[in-house]
Amino acid sequence: MSFNFIKDKNKHIHFIGIGGISMSGLAEILLYHNFTISGSDMNSSPITKKLKDKGAHIYIGHKKENIKDADLIVYTAAIASDNPEIIEAKEKNIKLMDRADFLGDLMKGYKYNIAISGTHGKTTTTSMLSHVALKANVDPTILVGGNLDIINGNVRVGKSDFFITEACEYKSSFLKFFPYIGAILNIDADHLDYYKDLDDIKNAFSKFIKLIPKDGYLVAYGEDKNIQSIIKEASCNVITYGINSGDIQAHNIEYDEKACGNFDVVKNNQKLFSVKLNVPGKHNILNSLASICIGLASNMKDKDIIEGIESFFGTHRRFELKGCKNNITVIDDYAHHPTEISATLDAAKKYPHNKLFCVFQPHTYSRTLTLFDDFTKCFDKADEIILADIYAAREKDTGIISSDMLGDKLRDRGLKCTNFHKFNDIKNYLIENAKDGDLILTVGAGDIYKVGEMYINL
């Protein structure tokens, strides 16, 4: 089954899980092009309301009746095979497409597809690059995994041949894409509920590299040893970046009082220009270098690259300042992998504060189990750790792993750590223990941000 922008113009397309960040973006692109769109989700949300306002037919709850007029159904990996709409579609021979296949077919309508891959930093880098592309007036279509203020959401429909999107490796989704420029930000062990091991993950990224045409570009973090081992697979143009090595480097790095980096961009030991970031941490210096490399490969002007990078103040849920209460700062971050948590805490330590509270909600049982040892070692820079229960997402609790088990290990290592089972109890603990000048950092890919909002809105 395939999708064609022109041939399928009069089709009714139904999205199962339309409230998801990527699915809603795809639906919005099609609504712009006057497709008939419907979709279902378990809960109403600002996303479903926005789609409804744009003309989509939205159903809350999954029922077989929802797909009665659909010609094509798009679903995500999170949708189970016993979903009533999936079952009904099969019985009625309505065409079904996985989200990644659908996005891949959508990309065929564009010449300059830019796909940002990597275990960490995809949303931030895609968002940063979007700022650069908009400053350069290339009029791109953008699909990003977070809400970006400059496009008032997670999607923008342009009229040029530029398409900018994230390329997630989960279930090898990114192997269904058609990148002209493919970026690999880093490679780390993750999604081990799908991949066998790190070598299996590296093999998937090797295949991603081979998708890039000979006249295209691979942009890669050259100081990542896992990337170094597969970069030879490229038959296209290759641009590497890094702090101490690579084609494009960051020199003379200085951090301001909020941990945001200022640095010179250097190529072949020659300074190209300087930039001042408005997002914190070393990891965002690397994210900006990837964006700069793509901008240069796309023949964007230096001044547009600089303005794009410097106008980027972050996306929602990426080191997002939620507010202050009694001179106590609350920041939220989406980090859910040990490497991401370490980077986020490193940035937070550079941020002005007295005591750093890290409120963490583990994301999925499988990730917590497979990366358990790494989770026990990534919180050392926090002064105090508060653990919520594991956010299940698409999984079921088998009783094998829990937040309490992680808390026990952290306490065994001498770290101050407290477990709570209810958000309200976490809020009350913070009310009692956070003092003037402290920093509360909520961390996780689930709904832990609600704790910060509860605290701010007292």
UniProtKB/Swiss-Prot annotation:
Q: What is its main location?
A: cytoplasm
Report the locations given in the UniProt record: Cytoplasm
Q: Which reaction does it catalyse?
A: UDP-N-acetyl-alpha-D-muramate + L-alanine + ATP = UDP-N-acetyl-alpha-D-muramoyl-L-alanine + ADP + phosphate + H(+)
Give the GO biological process terms: cell division; cell wall organization; peptidoglycan biosynthetic process; regulation of cell shape
Pathway the protein contributes to = Cell wall biogenesis; peptidoglycan biosynthesis
Keyword field:
ATP-binding, Cell cycle, Cell division, Cell shape, Cell wall biogenesis/degradation, Cytoplasm, Ligase, Nucleotide-binding, Peptidoglycan synthesis
Q: Superkingdom of the source?
A: Bacteria
List the Pfam families hit by this protein, alphabetically: Mur_ligase, Mur_ligase_C, Mur_ligase_M
Recorded GO terms, molecular function? ATP binding; UDP-N-acetylmuramate-L-alanine ligase activity
Question: Which InterPro entries does the record cross-reference, listed alphabetically?
Answer: Mur-like_cat_sf (IPR036565), Mur_ligase_C (IPR004101), Mur_ligase_C_dom_sf (IPR036615), Mur_ligase_cen (IPR013221), Mur_ligase_N (IPR000713), MurCDEF_pg_biosynth (IPR050061), UDP-N-AcMur_Ala_ligase_MurC (IPR005758)
Record-level GO cellular component terms: cytoplasm
Q: Where does ATP bind?
A: 118-124
SUPFAM superfamilies membership: MurCD N-terminal domain, MurD-like peptide ligases, catalytic domain, MurD-like peptide ligases, peptide-binding domain
Q: Which residues cross the membrane?
A: none
Keyword Cell cycle listed: yes
Q: What is its EC number?
A: 6.3.2.8
PANTHER family assigned: UDP-N-ACETYLMURAMATE--L-ALANINE LIGASE, UDP-N-ACETYLMURAMATE--L-ALANINE LIGASE-RELATED
Similarity comment text for this entry: Belongs to the MurCDEF family.
Entry-linked HAMAP family: MurC (MF_00046)
Q: What does this protein do?
A: Cell wall formation.
Supply the name of the protein: UDP-N-acetylmuramate--L-alanine ligase
